[in-house]
């Protein structure tokens, strides 16, 4: 086995003494830094490479800190102005994952870069920490490489805002296997519409 395979096995055992100590120290270190900062290199090179990262020019890693917990509805003094069924303010759950929120914040901050993917690097009782892989699409090393030319096209601008990254697709219910049967047909809305539309064919 190569070195990355051993690293992958280490990260799978997060309750081991080594990983518990490492994650605890790293979380303390990340808390001292700003909520969004550039990392000199990926904390998990094996995971980053599996998600498309290469240690060459044009690739950037940003580390994001996202606050854990539910979402409070932003209304003045709890006045939602509606039916009682929609009066909820405190126990609201956000539709997307914290990982997709981290990708969005990185994409907003680095508007000239494209978000490729992201991965988890740690968490404590208050925060979750993610590292986001971004690509400089105007760098010659990216534009001239056939494997990365696809992300330089304009259609991939701010893909993290439109749920096109891996974390975003997961929140939209898109994927393969029995867990994603609610989105057969492209999206939840399309699947619901097809199942709830009565079609009376002429010859039936």
From Swiss-Prot:
GO molecular function: RNA binding; structural constituent of ribosome
SUPFAM superfamilies linked to this entry: Ribosomal proteins S24e, L23 and L15e
Matching SMART domains: Ribosomal_L15e
Keywords, ordered alphabetically: Cytoplasm, Ribonucleoprotein, Ribosomal protein
GO biological process: cytoplasmic translation
Main subcellular location of this protein, as a coarse class: cytoplasm
Top-level lineage group: Eukaryota
GO CC field: cytosolic large ribosomal subunit
Keyword Ribosomal protein tagged: yes
InterPro entries on file: Rbsml_eL15_core_dom_sf, Ribosomal_eL15, Ribosomal_eL15_CS, Ribosomal_uL23/eL15/eS24_sf
Subcellular location(s) of the protein: Cytoplasm
Function of the molecule: Component of the large ribosomal subunit. The ribosome is a large ribonucleoprotein complex responsible for the synthesis of proteins in the cell.
Family: Belongs to the eukaryotic ribosomal protein eL15 family.
Subunit field text: Component of the large ribosomal subunit.
Protein name as it appears in the record: Large ribosomal subunit protein eL15
């Amino acid at each position: 086995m190569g070195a990355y395979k051993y690293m992958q096995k280490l990260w799978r055992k997060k309750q081991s003494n080594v990983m518990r100590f490492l994650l605890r120290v790293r979380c303390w270190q990340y808390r001292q830094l700003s909520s969004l900062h550039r990392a000199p290199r990926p904390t998990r090179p094996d995971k980053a490479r599996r998600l498309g990262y290469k240690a060459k020019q044009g690739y950037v890693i940003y580390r994001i800190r996202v606050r854990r917990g539910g979402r409070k509805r932003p209304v003045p003094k709890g006045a939602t102005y509606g039916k009682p069924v929609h009066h909820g303010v405190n126990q609201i759950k956000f539709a997307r994952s914290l990982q997709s929120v981290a990708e969005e914040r990185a994409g907003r901050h680095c508007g000239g870069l494209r978000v490729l993917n992201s991965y988890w690097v740690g968490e404590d009782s208050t925060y979750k920490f993610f590292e986001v892989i971004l690509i400089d699409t105007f760098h010659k090393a990216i534009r001239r490489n056939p494997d990365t030319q696809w992300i330089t096209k304009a259609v991939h601008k701010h893909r993290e805002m439109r749920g096109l990254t891996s974390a975003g697709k997961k929140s939209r219910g898109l994927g393969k296997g029995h867990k994603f049967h609610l989105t057969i047909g492209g999206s939840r809305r399309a699947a619901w519409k097809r199942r709830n539309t009565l079609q009376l064919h002429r010859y039936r």
